[in-house]
Amino acid sequence: MTERVALVTGGNGGIGTEICRQLSSGGYRVVTTCVNPEAEGVEAWAAALREEGHDIGWVQCNVADFDACARMATEVEAEFGSVDVLVNVAGITRDAFLHKMDADNWRSVIDVNLNSAFNVTRQFVTGMRERGFGRIVNISSVNGQTGQFGQTNYSAAKAGMHGFTMALAKESAPKGVTVNTVSPGYVRTSMTDAIPDKVREAIIGQIPAGRLGEPQDIARAVAFLVADEAGYINGANIPVNGALFCSF
């Protein structure tokens, strides 16, 4: 395989970092996006990964802004080359029961978690089609399948992401482009580490596997889906949730 360029949006979070790490280990030239490099400590993050042997590039971009994504795409392809692999990871939460949720918190979650998939994918899918190869993976959530208290915005966005996946897979398959979803369950990250112990134990008690997922569990699924050999897997939703939710 020639070195393919892989773009991972929001790749400096817990799950995103491991995706970047595993794709880099697999021989991809990995680039990520961040909104506020200074606040997010991206330079220190990238330096730590370089110490491990992973040279991860980064560009500043608000993925909720279509025009910003267009500028980002120009910058990425000028510096790193054509993007053949896209992993849409960027996401936020703004939790509240719907009867208490304000419009800004609804819109911000839909913009970052769902509209960003269009904003970013739109910049690269044409090139993938023209080259006859592309791998797009959208990171959704078990809560997009089950719903969750206080997360009408998040659940709607994550459910919508897989609808986006299925439709785009049908459009793109004739051109050698695959589009798939990975839906994590509860994963051990800094966010879940901050949950009170009793709450975290109650969550784990609901998971048949008896543990939280690890970022590596999600990243391995992504690495599998973006491989050249995975070209016949298209429009799928891969649950990585320890049997918390099972469906067909």
What residue spans do the PLM features occupy?
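Conserved glycine-rich cofactor-binding loop
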Residues: 12-13
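Conserved glycine-rich Rossmann-like NAD(P)H-binding loop of the short-chain dehydrogenase/reductase
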Residues: 26-43
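Substrate-binding pocket helix/loop in short-chain dehydrogenase/reductase
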Residues: 97-98, 105-110, 192, 203
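Active-site helix of classical SDR
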Residues: 121, 157, 165
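Alpha-helical segment proximal to the catalytic Tyr-Lys
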Residues: 126, 170-174, 231
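Residue(s) in the substrate-gating loop at a strand-loop-helix junction
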Residues: 141
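Short C-terminal tail/terminal secondary-structure segment
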Residues: 146-149, 223, 234-248
